[in-house]
Amino acid sequence: MSPNGPGAPAGAPALVLSAPSGAGKTSISKALVQTWDDCLFSVSATTRPAREHETEGLHYHFMSEPDFVAMRDAGQLLEWAEVHGHMYGTPQSNLDAARQRGLHLILDIDVQGAKQLRAKVSDAVFVFVLPPSAETLVGRLRGRGTEADEVVERRLRNARGEMEQAFDFDYVVVNDDLDRAVAEVRAITVGNVEFSLRAVDMSGTIRQLQTRIDDILSEGFSA
């Protein structure tokens, strides 16, 4: 479907994007929604405080922990997870709205949430996004300018573990060039995909990244 074309047909599958922090899944998600009218971004709920540039309802639905827990206990979340000390979740209403409009819901969530969605949303497509190198990942994390070195190191350690979960996803995309990564994810969304993007075929790339992260951490986080 071309940009700005008609909406996706009824039953358009949801697209679940997961990645280590700094791999670029949010940039890919935003590009899909900005370019194609048949995509709807799923705004997550979170207990994390808003950053200076973030807007309620656009980046996240920011809420207190008691309100989040009440929503979860009422069965109003498709998935939820605690990440880096904060709770994140996907409101059921996001998927309902997308299905009513015949749109692909684009979910930008962590690997814990993706696992829960796998059990609940049978027609969703799951994509794991990788950085092109461990050095690039470190650079992106540091380039945010909002995290202390110890936080970046913790995220790098978490990234190494999250990459192990990539084999549970349908496809793996390496975000070495944003436009190309967006094109690959779009192809996956509409079912026009290269077999080489299957997770099982990317095992060598995943293992190389993990090994290099191990090296960086053992060198005292000096990348």
Short names for language-model regions:
Residues 1-15:
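Extreme N-terminal, non-catalytic leader segments
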Residues 25:
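Conserved lysine of the Walker
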Residues 34-42:
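Post-Walker A helix-loop "phosphate-sensing" segment adjacent to the P-loop in P-loop NTPases
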